[in-house]
């Protein structure tokens, strides 16, 4: 309501529903993601995908997800957990997803205080929040509560119908003159009995080079289960080989709900192989192959200070959104 030019919102008692892992709750979560997540994540997750990922979270991460109810209707959800990719009992991550309308600010405030209370009870030293919507609405909300942005990620996308190898002849020609070979995991695993270890070692070294606000501590079994999910395709992992050594990769993740769109997983090169155009070459090869497979769009996320963002722009990706982390 309004009074004398000021907006007044009634205070609502926080009403939350604990997630119970039932089919109904997974379906509700996916429907809320479709409603509240921005493109390209909208209509990306399926119940099967959510259920699989949830089952992987170790008990030590103490994951908690709640639905937030307002006026008798579920309007969003929030969650807290220790990061499974770099477990630290002193650091608790969180998300809060509700409609970006001022009438829900009171709900958001009460739920954030609920999350912070839980963090204090767990005696963590750092409380972080991640927003899939890098809007000023969310940034202002967290800023008012004393958070500082610690990571800004740019989301970009390319339409493959506008991607042609002729535009990158110099890069392709230069790479062909080298001794490096681009293959995919489907082919390389036939030639390498220790392919899982090789891929993990490459993945771990490349991941350590990504400018994030987290100290990674990859567990092999967790990594394996996360990467090799039921909808994973070995043909979507492109690897650059130098003799017997795996030196660079570009991985892609499919959705069970989208046949024409695919997400980039991880692209990078070992530090000692930098500045040779290897990342550009493997990415060009991957995009051309994905185009042949029938995909129409590829999207990705890069930290603002990640060199891969500039490489992607050079290849024709266009920035379409932002995500951010704060603490």
Indicate where each model-derived feature is located.
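Conserved acetyl-CoA-binding loop-helix of GNAT-fold acetyltransferases
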Residues: 104-117, 269, 275-288, 310-314
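Short amphipathic alpha-helix that is part of the acyltransferase structural core
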Residues: 2-53, 171-217
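Active-site/acyl-donor-binding loops of N-acyltransferases
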Residues: 145-165, 236-238, 264-265, 288-327
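Acyl-donor-binding surface of acyltransferase catalytic domains
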Residues: 2-12, 84, 99-191, 323-327
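A mid-sequence, solvent-exposed acidic-amphipathic segment
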Residues: 213-239, 243-249
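Conserved donor-binding loop and adjoining core beta-sheet/short helix segment
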Residues: 12, 18-26, 30-134, 241-242, ...
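Short alpha-helical
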Residues: 24, 136-137, 306-307
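Extended, compositionally biased non-globular segments
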Residues: 240, 249-250, 273, 278, ...
């Amino acid at each position: 309501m309004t009074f004398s030019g000021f907006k007044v919102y009634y205070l609502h008692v926080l009403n939350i529903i604990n997630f119970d892992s039932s089919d109904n709750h997974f379906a509700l979560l996916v429907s809320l993601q479709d409603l509240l997540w921005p493109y390209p994540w909208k209509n990306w997750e399926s119940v099967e995908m959510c259920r699989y990922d949830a089952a992987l979270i170790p008990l030590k991460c103490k994951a908690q997800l709640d639905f937030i109810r307002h006026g008798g209707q579920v309007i969003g959800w929030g969650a807290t957990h220790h990061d499974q990719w770099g477990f630290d009992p002193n650091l608790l991550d969180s998300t809060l997803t509700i409609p970006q309308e001022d009438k829900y600010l009171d709900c958001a405030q009460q739920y954030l205080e609920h999350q912070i209370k839980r963090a204090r009870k767990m005696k963590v030293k750092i409380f972080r929040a991640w927003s899939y919507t890098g809007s000023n609405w969310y940034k202002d909300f967290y800023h008012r509560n004393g958070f500082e942005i610690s990571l800004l990620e740019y989301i970009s996308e390319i339409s493959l119908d506008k991607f042609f190898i002729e535009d990158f002849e110099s890069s392709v020609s230069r790479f062909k003159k080298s001794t490096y070979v681009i293959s995919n995991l489907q082919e390389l695993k036939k030639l390498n009995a220790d392919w899982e270890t090789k891929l993990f070692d490459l993945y771990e070294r490349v991941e350590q080079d990504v400018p994030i606000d987290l100290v990674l501590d990859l567990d092999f079994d967790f990594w394996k289960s996360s990467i090799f999910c039921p909808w994973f395709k070995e043909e979507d992992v492109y690897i650059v080989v130098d003799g017997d050594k795996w030196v660079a990769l570009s991985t892609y993740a499919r959705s069970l709900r989208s046949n024409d769109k695919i997400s980039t997983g991880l692209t990078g090169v070992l530090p000692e192989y930098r500045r040779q155009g290897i990342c550009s070459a493997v990415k060009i090869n991957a995009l051309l192959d994905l185009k042949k497979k029938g995909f129409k769009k590829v999207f990705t996320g890069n930290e603002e200070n990640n060199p891969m963002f500039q490489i992607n722009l050079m290849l024709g990706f266009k920035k379409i959104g932002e995500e951010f982390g704060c603490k």
